[in-house]
Amino acid sequence: MLTFRKIVDFYIHSSIHVGVAVFCLVQLSVPQWTSYSFLVFFGTVVGYNFLKYSEWFFTHQFFRIQYIGILVVTLISALGFSLLFLQQDATVQLNLILAFGLVVLYPFVRKIGWLKPFYVSFVVSYITLFVPLKSDVDVIVLFVQRFLLLSSVMIPFEILDSSKDAVAMKTLPHCFGIARTKQIGYGLVGLF
């Protein structure tokens, strides 16, 4: 049981679950198993780990034994992302560079707490829907639907994290209260 717990902890801390979730969203848009789906998986793991562990990446603390597995997963994902990125056509590469710019802006957007879930939903929708289906006529409708779905799914996590987040962050629960934040989530689901 202890081994299973260690595996689950590693799976969660290395952000593989986030990569799998975003991979699945790409598969909803483009059902065939394309290199783009795996590119997004690897890119998500790298980007999420970089944002999550950025303060440790630049210190000697990160090279402690408990972080080595996460570092290895991140480096393998970076290699996979790089190789698959080079296989994409120029339009996809340009769109991914734009998405990378949006990810780099995330730490600044995070300071505007109430905007964070909507920003993340926009970036994930852009990567999982707009880039692979940019020429599809229904892409705008699908994009709005995915944005509403992702925003509503993030609301419970915003509420859960509200006890840990500083009030100065002004997250949705801090700005509107938990009951009103739930109503916002219900409204987003209704619009979806």
For each predicted feature, which ranges?
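Helix-coil boundary and interhelical linker segments in multi-pass alpha-helical membrane proteins
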Residues: 20-40, 80-94, 128-144, 192
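Solvent-exposed interhelical
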Residues: 40, 44-75, 151-189
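The first (N-terminal) embedded transmembrane alpha-helix
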Residues: 8-28, 118-127
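Intramembrane alpha-helical segments
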Residues: 63-135
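Short, amphipathic, aromatic/basic-enriched membrane-interface segments that mark the entry/exit
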Residues: 4-15, 60-70, 87-90, 110-117, ...
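Functional transmembrane core segments of multi-pass inner-membrane proteins
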Residues: 120-163
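Membrane-embedded alpha-helical segments that form the functional core of polytopic membrane enzymes
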Residues: 30-50, 97-101, 138-156
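Alpha-helical membrane-inserting segments
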Residues: 25, 29, 47-54, 102-105, ...
